[in-house]
């Protein structure tokens, strides 16, 4: 198997994408944060002391997508053309499902940006609620779709 992020000396390198065609690309990632039912209720009611948890988490997720290349060493800086973060409150399972959709037109995909957006949104929820619930669990973060580029469409069965 040819490792694309390793040079001839066996050292890390950023892949050269300059010869790749620019294409419209999209990535969708999801994840969940489980919490006590009381915590979920308070988020829903807007009574968390630190403020509007989902509004802050949404902005944090978007900012994270835009700054992925600053956190993940081999990620290329990408001009993101769109980023949307959505939340679904699941009272039956006492969790919040998070979804990030990231778009660009470029030479490399935005999978890492979508995954980073979901992760940071979940971490932000944790941060804003940890005073009342330290048992929260962030899990099930995964890429569910990517399109564009040479490899085309990928969709995970969920």
UniProtKB/Swiss-Prot annotation:
Natural source organism: Thermoanaerobacter sp. (strain X514)
Pathway annotation: Cofactor biosynthesis; molybdopterin biosynthesis
Lineage: Bacteria, Bacillati, Bacillota, Clostridia, Thermoanaerobacterales
Keyword tags: Lyase, Molybdenum cofactor biosynthesis
Record function comment: Catalyzes the conversion of (8S)-3',8-cyclo-7,8-dihydroguanosine 5'-triphosphate to cyclic pyranopterin monophosphate (cPMP).
Gene Ontology terms describing biological process: Mo-molybdopterin cofactor biosynthetic process
Binding residue positions for substrate: 74-76, 112-113
InterPro entries: MoaC (IPR023045), MoaC_bact/euk (IPR047594), MoaC_sf (IPR036522), MoCo_biosynth_MoaA/MoaC (IPR050105), Mopterin_CF_biosynth-C_dom (IPR002820)
Name of this chain's protein: Cyclic pyranopterin monophosphate synthase
GO molecular function terms noted in the UniProt entry: cyclic pyranopterin monophosphate synthase activity
């Amino acid at each position: 198997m040819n490792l694309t992020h390793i040079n001839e000396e066996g050292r890390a390198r950023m892949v050269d994408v300059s010869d790749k065609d620019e294409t419209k690309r999209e990535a969708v990632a999801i994840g969940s944060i489980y919490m006590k039912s009381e915590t979920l209720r308070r988020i829903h009611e807007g009574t968390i002391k630190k403020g509007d948890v989902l509004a802050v988490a949404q902005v944090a997720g978007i900012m994270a997508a835009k700054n992925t290349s600053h956190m993940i060493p081999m990620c290329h800086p990408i001009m993101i053309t769109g980023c949307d973060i959505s939340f679904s409150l699941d009272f039956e399972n006492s969790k919040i499902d998070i979804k990030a959709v990231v778009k660009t037109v470029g030479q490399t995909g935005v999978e890492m940006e979508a995954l980073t957006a979901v992760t940071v949104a979940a971490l932000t929820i944790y941060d804003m609620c940890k005073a009342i619930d330290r048992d929260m669990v962030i899990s099930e973060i995964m890429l569910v779709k990517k399109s564009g580029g040479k490899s085309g469409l990928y969709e995970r069965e969920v």
